[in-house]
Amino acid sequence: YDGVSISDMRASLIMSARTKVELEPNYSYVTARILLDELRSEALSFLGVAEQSTQQEMFDYYPKALQAFIEKGIELEMLNPELKTFDLNKLGKAINPDNDFKFTYLGLQTLYDRYFIHSNDIRYELPQIFFMRVAMGLAIEEEDRENRAIEFYNLLSSFDYMSSTPTLFNSGTMRPQLSSCYLTTIPDDLDGIFSAMKDNALLSK
């Protein structure tokens, strides 16, 4: 219809393409590419880098977006200010935009819905910046932290290794809680054992 936005067109394409995944699994990658275009437009425009981008342009835009993301995240009090002391030029050059194409639709949609940092419902964290932010948080106390961050990034972005959910959520942020487990003490009697089971169930809830 007249006046339809590009964002609404992408939403319609995503709804249409994802219904075909059961018929042809490769549609999962097609749908992920459409969602990726929407995310790039959303994040890059919010960060003031660009309104739209081609894949080739992302090799120039990703380093710029990393710098802008760190600055904006610190400004919004979402990211650890220590991240700004990294050599962001070196880290930006290590980002591989082609790794964005490794995502299936479900994987990218899950990150979009739950993991990417956002402000007022605008996602301004791109997939490779997400992995680099996690890597920077993990390497923040290392001696050679830029190279360690790049090593962590390469493992994460290639899907050779994936951190647990608390690490993905919190690494590099103002809430650097990276553990996904808790230690509890249990009294050595029947009442204590079953009380601990109840406490753990409530904690999981």
Where are these regions (language model features)?
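Extended catalytic cores of very large enzyme megasubunits
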Residues: 1-205
